[in-house]
Amino acid sequence: MKVVWSREDELTWAPFGPAMAIDLAADLDERGEVLAWRGEVWSNGHTMRPGRAKIPTLLAASQLARPFDRPVSVDPPFAGGGGSQRNAVPGYDFPALRVECHRVLEMPLRASALRSLGAFANVFAIESLADDIARSRGEDPVAWRLRHVSDPRARAVIESVARRSSWGSARSGEGFGRGIGWARYKGAGAYCAVVAEVELTHEVRVRRLVIAADVGFAVNPDGVANQVEGGAIQAASWTLKEAVRFDRTRVADRGWESYPILRFSEVPRVEVEVLQREEEASVGAGEAAQGPTAAAIANAVRDAIGVRVRDLPITAERIAAATLAEEAQTA
């Protein structure tokens, strides 16, 4: 027997990346310094992979004449990186912090692992607020980060991308923005920092990504660079375009013709520096760039137009909505 799923089957019935909602707040003193950091995360579980549960997790198991119950997605243990919790704890030297994660058990669509799990959304959110705090003080975003990071390896990737991107140089023109984001994957894995340069016309175009990665001892530096570059391009697509569109009855995108995804003509110039650490243990490179890339692009958009977009993907419609919301707040 041979079973072949069509492209429509894959796009409409396969599990999707979990939805996430993140609420962050920081207590500041009269000088704008962080006294405490608070975060709450709501999300589906981030894995429903076959072989990890006591009952079958494949779709067909729930469609049999005598069906198995469809299991609820779970989060991997936090000690192994977690799911929705992944990178929910910021990598900054704050005096106090509290982070809570809530697993949403029921949603209309099946969810399972998407590359980097919760790190993509968590780093996007954390680095967005970090940038806003720095700007509220009138402080350079790179300088603010370096002032709140004591880990020398984290500082090294931030300093690398700042130097190679000519951070602080003059703007290239109207609609140009530059932003930075960084994280240590899972809080214990690879370090990655990204500077994004964007141009806004009728949509956001990422023109350049400058990346530094520290994976410990890089056995194959070219392979590491390829993994980081691929992850960054994929993250750019998620950040600007990709989303599951559905109505009350079905998933709307049933083929690549309508699904919003980054095209070859939209792929930015990507520059990757691998910081070799022969004295350190090797760690994975494949998921380090996702969160920092999203954060860098979002912060670059904020730099270009002065408006914070808090919902992904960053489409023209969401930029317009964020602009109207900000104007209403200041009116």
Protein language model features and the residues they cover:
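Cofactor-binding beta-sheet edge motifs in enzyme active sites
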Residues: 1-331
